[in-house]
Amino acid sequence: MIIFMCKQYEHTIAITNRKLVQGDFLEQMQKVIHLHPHAVILREKDLSDKEYEILAEKILEMCRESGVRCFLHSRISVANRLGCRRIHMSIPVLMSMCEEERSQMRKNFQEISVSCHSMEDMDTAVRCGATQIILGTIFETECKKGLKGKGLGFVAEICKACPVPVYAIGGINLKRLPQVMDAGAAGGCMMSGFMRI
């Protein structure tokens, strides 16, 4: 039973949002990490660098103990201080960096994850060194009500053109995961699905 549960999450990426957690965030993350998702992206964009670093140190340790990849979100200096070799970037942040900064990022990180919303974003991300793409928004979500999802055709179009793994985001759950994978995605990202598990 436990092996089956872990297997069903092997193509998922857990995106954190401690504001969705009822109870202790670290306890929730322990539960999530024990499910062995493909990776965790520690988002928590509202925290100061110092607060984020304190939290990241704990989450990175949990992930290391369980053999789960952990990406820090946009905090390159924090990642460098903590020895984390995985970073997740948004396209606007990536575009604001000069070529020298992007080159340094490619040297410092073994995996670079980038959020994309169009073919142009994907091309830019890959050119800048992305090793995986987080593609959204595929289905309508709770956190972005009213924003129409781009659908499975969009996933297929991007996956066909993209030389690196693509993970779909936006309204993804375990029932929809096979649909995005059939469209060519390597897997899917879940936020509320993991924060409320």
Short names for language-model regions:
Residues 29-35, 64-65, 103-107, 126-127, ...:
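Acidic (Asp/Glu)-rich catalytic clusters
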Residues 14, 90-99, 134-146, 172-197:
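Glycine-rich phosphate-binding active-site loops on the catalytic face of alpha/beta enzymes
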Residues 53-72, 100-118, 148-173:
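Alpha-helix-loop-beta-strand connector modules within alpha/beta enzyme cores
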Residues 29, 56, 60, 76, ...:
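Generic hydrophobic/aromatic pocket-lining and core-packing "Φ" positions
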Residues 29, 145-148:
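Active-site-adjacent loop and "lid" segments of alpha/beta metabolic enzymes
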Residues 70-85, 117-129, 161-162, 166-167, ...:
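Catalytic cores of alpha/beta
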Residues 1-27, 92:
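N-terminal amphipathic alpha-helix/helix-capping segment at the start of soluble metabolic enzymes
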Residues 15-18, 38-51, 60-99, 109-123, ...:
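Catalytic beta/alpha-barrel core
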